[in-house]
A protein has these predicted regions:
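Sec-dependent bacterial lipoprotein signal peptides
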Residues: 1-7
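Aromatic-residue-lined binding/catalytic grooves and analogous aromatic/hydrophobic interfacial grooves
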Residues: 8-11, 46, 151-170, 183-212
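Membrane-proximal, proline-rich intrinsically disordered regions
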Residues: 8-64, 68-72, 80-83, 87, ...
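Secretory-pathway/luminal and periplasmic proteins that interact with or process carbohydrate-rich
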Residues: 39-43, 117-127, 204-206
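Conserved, well-structured interaction surfaces
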Residues: 61-173
Length: 212
């Protein structure tokens, strides 16, 4: 008669996914978010916006010109702005803020890009999720008023400008696809973006007054 028994290893790690990272470099999150943001601006948003504004002529071969309003691309741009851009930048900010010492330039770069993405999203769609968005804590974030979103973007830029150290590059520098860690250029960009948003808010107020 033969008897067999089975048992688990004493220190079994079967509940630990070996393919899932438990820590991440904020520089990689930043480069991933910036790449996706640029891709969305060039590929996902260019052609539908250009066609709707009659900047492009498709010759009748594009679906939009045939009144075939497929939401795939537009919804993709909306969703991926939050999942691929805002979410990754939020995580990068959290990691940079908890590092010792706090990497202020990294936080500033992430917040500037985040303000850029939120401003673009709001100027395209109006009221959007902002205060509760991309935190990983709220499944159905509320929609904030467009004016509140743009004001929040300005506040985000002011916070970032106050953190910039032009003499330091920080941990994101090797993965900075825009300015290679040159914080003086990031400061110029943040100020230019702030001016652009302020002009947009002024125009929005004029439109609201005009239409009553």
């Amino acid at each position: 008669m033969a008897i067999s028994t089975t048992a688990c290893f004493k220190d079994s790690n079967i509940n630990v996914d070996p393919n899932r990272s438990t820590s991440v470099d904020p520089a990689l999150l930043f480069s991933g978010a910036s790449t996706q943001f640029s891709l969305l601006r060039v590929a996902e948003l260019t052609w539908p916006i250009a066609l709707m504004n009659q900047m492009w002529a498709s010759g009748g071969r594009w679906g939009l010109s045939q009144a075939q309003y497929d939401q795939t691309r537009i919804r993709s741009a909306w969703g991926r702005t939050y999942t691929d851009v805002h979410k990754n930048l939020n995580v990068a900010v959290e990691i940079a803020q908890t590092s010792q010492p706090v990497n202020k330039n990294a936080v500033a770069q992430c917040k500037i890009l985040m303000a850029f993405a939120y401003a673009q999203t709001s100027l395209l769609w109006g009221d959007i999720p902002f205060t509760e968005a991309a935190t990983g804590k709220v499944d159905f974030p509320k929609f904030d008023k467009q004016q509140d979103v743009l004001n929040g973007c300005i506040a985000m830029l002011d916070e970032a400008l106050g953190m910039i150290d032009p003499n330091g590059k920080g941990i994101i520098a090797p993965n900075d696809l825009y300015y290679g860690g040159d914080m003086a250029k990031w400061r110029k960009f943040a100020n230019s973006l702030k001016m652009r948003i302020l002009i947009s808010t002024k125009l929005l107020k004029m439109i609201i007054i005009t239409i009553g």
